[in-house]
UniProtKB/Swiss-Prot annotation:
It comes from Rattus norvegicus (Rat). InterPro entries: Peptidase_S1_PA, Peptidase_S1_PA_chymotrypsin, Peptidase_S1A, Trypsin_dom, TRYPSIN_SER. It comes from the Eukaryota. The keyword Cell cycle does not apply. Disulfide bonds join 79-146, 111-125, 136-161. SUPFAM superfamilies: Trypsin-like serine proteases (SSF50494). Its EC number is 3.4.21.35. SMART domains: Tryp_SPc (SM00020). Gene3D superfamilies: Trypsin-like serine proteases. This is Glandular kallikrein-3, submandibular. It catalyses: Preferential cleavage of Arg-|-Xaa bonds in small molecule substrates. Highly selective action to release kallidin (lysyl-bradykinin) from kininogen involves hydrolysis of Met-|-Xaa or Leu-|-Xaa.
């Protein structure tokens, strides 16, 4: 059993607590592929899990509904990422305040050149090529919001984070909206 805290921007804030009654990992998420006892390049496609809360969230100034994408995000868009992950690229250091930064949506070709792991059309590439602005260890599952729409979910990137020419990789939600809606419909 686990729970979520909704609307938290600082560790000392009083927020909404909700138990998670069920989780739904995407059925095609298979991060470790082995063939002939040899590890192949990791493929983190379909890196997505939905959580069903034991009771609905209260919509407030700090807890809002966000739109799912209805069209492809545009390369060059400025997007907001946030998370509670490490603030130190090389070590585990966690903040007392939710961290947010604006980054740019890049072509997937930039990430294909940067990584030996597979970058697929189920992913988005975002960051700053000069480095310094990135999600980091512990931020996975956080939002990538472009023009007020939830376009991606933080998936993976370089270690250490924030390296030049090593943008972050995000699950591309436009590819999963049918699955999301189906799971929500079947589990009201």
């Amino acid at each position: 059993n686990y729970h979520v805290l909704l609307g938290q921007n600082n560790l000392s804030e009083d927020v909404q607590h909700r138990l998670v009654s069920q989780s739904f990992r995407h059925p095609d998420y298979k991060p470790f592929l082995m063939r002939n006892h040899t590890r192949k390049p990791k493929d983190y496609s379909n890196d997505l899990m939905l959580l069903h809360l034991s009771e609905p969230a209260d919509i407030t100034d700090g807890v809002k509904v966000i739109d799912l994408p209805t069209k492809e995000p545009k390369v060059g868009s400025t997007c907001l990422v946030s998370g509670w992950g490490s603030t130190n690229p090389s070590e585990w250091e966690f903040p007392d305040d939710l961290q947010c930064v604006n980054i740019h949506l890049l072509s997937n070709e930039k990430c294909i050149k940067a990584y030996k792991e597979k970058v697929t059309d189920l992913m988005l590439c975002a960051g700053e090529l000069e480095g310094g602005k990135d999600t980091c260890r512990g931020d996975s599952g956080g939002p990538l919001i472009c023009d007020g729409v939830l376009q991606g979910i933080t998936s993976w990137g370089s270690v250490p984070c924030g390296e030049p020419n090593k943008p972050g990789i995000y699950t591309k939600l436009i590819k999963f909206t049918s699955w999301i809606k189906e799971v929500m419909k079947e589990n009201p």
